[in-house]
Design a protein with these regions (language model features):
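S-adenosylmethionine
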Residues: 1-250
Length: 250
């Protein structure tokens, strides 16, 4: 109960993370969620360079710090509204956590590849993959609902990626036309979101233990369909934004 009370998390959740990571690590995890977090962004390399973007943002009064792992990632602060920043309106950067960027960075994406993003909204990984294609190849970006595909389309228009096609599609439904055709499959699947509680504090109150099991089952169902799209020698990158090992390693 100490961890639950100290870090303001439901008791079932504190027990789960302690069981999976140990008490000391669990406390560090929950403490990190209480810290203020600057926005993390990814440079749109098809429009600018990291150096040019950093300079432009600083001239606009934005505080810019380099990311921890990737040369085109930055954290930004000292701003009120993204829409006021010309570089954002012009599609020179996207808001995207560096962990999300790493999921695409580790993929061996080459010019001319066919990339499929199966649960894509709002499109962060889709556009990162498109950037890495350098104008060649194609990214097929799919999600379940019209609302989600519209989000992807909005970001596509702002970022000006011409090698991205957006489709509304249920990932549980097999698409025979894609069997063994994809060079890189991005599968950032529906999850509990327990890894982003620092940004979305309400997650810990909305999620239940029962839902964790349901989400893990859904992930398995989706993976049982989409892995068939990967061509021999291709790659599937599976990722989530949760800490729950039941939705990841297990």
């Amino acid at each position: 109960k100490y961890v639950s009370i100290t870090y303001s998390v439901p008791e079932w959740l504190s027990k789960l993370i302690i069981e999976q990571y140990g008490k000391e690590s669990a406390e560090k995890i929950f403490a990190s969620f209480l810290e203020a977090r600057p926005l993390t962004i990814r440079t749109n390399l098809s429009k600018t360079t990291p150096e040019e973007l950093e300079k432009e943002l600083e001239e606009a009064g934005v505080k810019v710090e380099k990311g921890n792992y990737l040369p085109y990632a930055f954290t930004i602060s000292n701003l009120n509204y993204l829409g006021k920043i010309a570089a954002f309106r012009q599609g020179k950067f996207a808001v995207q956590d560096e962990s999300s960027q790493l999921a695409v960075a580790i993929a061996d994406i080459n010019e001319g590849d066919f990339v499929l993003d199966v649960c894509a909204a709002p499109g962060g990984k889709t556009f990162h993959a498109a950037d890495r294609l350098k104008g060649a190849g194609k990214v097929l970006s799919r999600d379940l609902t019209e609302y989600k595909t519209e989000l992807i389309e909005e970001n596509k228009d702002r970022m000006h990626y011409e090698n991205v096609e957006v489709q509304q599609w249920d990932a549980l439904e097999e698409d025979e036309s894609l069997l063994e055709s994809v060079d890189v499959l991005l599968a950032d699947l529906p999850c509990s979101g327990l890894g982003i509680m620092g940004r979305k504090n309400d997650i810990k109150y909305q999620m239940t233990e029962e839902q964790l099991g349901e989400l893990a089952a859904l992930q398995r169902q989706i993976l049982s369909v989409v892995w068939k799209y990967v061509k021999p020698g291709g790659q599937m990158i599976f990722s989530t934004c949760t800490l729950n090992k039941g939705e990841n390693a297990e």
